[in-house]
Amino acid sequence: MNKFSKGLLLSLALVYSHEILATERLVVWEDVGRASTIASAVKDFEKIYDCDVDVLEKPMYHQVELLEKQGPKGEGPDVVVLASDMVGVAKDKNLISQIHFMQVENSQYLPNSIASVTFDGELYSVPKTIETLILFYNKDLLKEPPTTLEEYVDLSKKLRKKGKYGLLAKWELFYTTYALMNGYGAYIFRTDNDGTINLNSYGLDTDGAVESLKVLRKMSKADLVYDCLSGVDGYNRMYELFSSKKAIAVINGPWAIEDYLKAGINFGITTLPTLPNGNPMAGFLGTKGYSISKWSTHKDLAEDFLRFINEHKNALLRYKESRQVPPVISVLQDPSLANDELIQVIAQQSVHAVNMPSIPEMSYVWSVMDKAIWKVIHAGLPIDHILEDARKDIESYIQTRIKNN
């Protein structure tokens, strides 16, 4: 054997041995500021599966756009984190893959969190956290929170005379006001038995929807829908009033907890109040979860990672570090969390909450309904006329989309 042949064989042997020893590498996109909450689980996974996991922080609401650009080039991640409405968008754009193990293990999760990421009977995300509107109250000002909206209205009227506020909420947003409408039987679109959203079954102009917005208009006329909370700075103003003890209670999501803790507010958490018709007030349920890129070349390892990240121990630790509530049933029932206010309230509130439809048409629904709610609060037009106009606008948009597609 000549020197060239020996050298060639040696080179081939080195290349082959390198391929055998090469470690699989997963690239995971996490939301900004959240990588640290899964760091411990990632380290354990790397040891058990003898692999490397690179966790990169990317703004969650830009991940679909980034995946669409980078995925086809082979530069994208294996795993992304998406809100449930964006899971629907990513699925429609053929950017993400079905997650096979979830077909068997979905019973370990709250049913409505599973429904929010299921399309045509297939699951496209592993739910990481759920969010819905809840009520925060200042324990220094209110020892026992009222249980009905009418009680909060009466309390708010008394406090306004003293220059203070009772219950604050961003009522001009459809996202908030839907919690009223839902309690009166209104809905956006019906969901068929197979899980398909029926765009021909529209329910934001029903008699119940009208009645719910009469409640809102009544509060507005009593000067309990505050202009100071309108606009992009409304949440900041609400925070200022609550943290300075000028407001007794606020309707907000669990994402506000971190700020309230930093402000040193002695707050309690409870479910939203009961409506005048006796039904619970309940808003949308938002689910965030992990999905697998269509272009991932490590799909099996990615599925192993997603199963591992939501094992009881890891999901429990993630909750304690992030205060993001996982829809993992065993965690919600963990004895160590029996007295955890946030866990208990989110679990109760999510029973009545409604999944946000994961369809492209929702971006237009938000816009139209925000304008409709503004008219209910600020204009004297009949509520049924306002909602009828909104319906016509939304239906026209849907028909145009259907024709163009």
Give the positions of each predicted feature.
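Conserved N-terminal structural module of periplasmic/extracytoplasmic solute-binding proteins
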Residues: 20-87, 278, 336, 385, ...
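A structural signal for short loop-to-beta-strand junctions that line the ligand-binding cleft
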Residues: 69, 77-78, 106-139, 166-169, ...
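Hinge/lid segment of periplasmic solute-binding proteins
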Residues: 84-134, 144, 149-155, 268-270, ...
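Short, solvent-exposed loop/beta-turn-alpha elements that line the ligand-binding surface or hinge
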Residues: 101-109, 187-211, 262, 274-283
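Extracytoplasmic/periplasmic solute-binding protein
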Residues: 124-128, 133, 153-205
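Glycine-centered hinge/linker elements that transmit conformational signals in sensory
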Residues: 156, 198-230
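Extracytoplasmic/periplasmic substrate-recognition and gating elements
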Residues: 224, 261-324
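Long, aromatic- and glycine/proline-rich binding clefts that accommodate carbohydrate-like moieties
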Residues: 270, 319-371, 375, 400-403
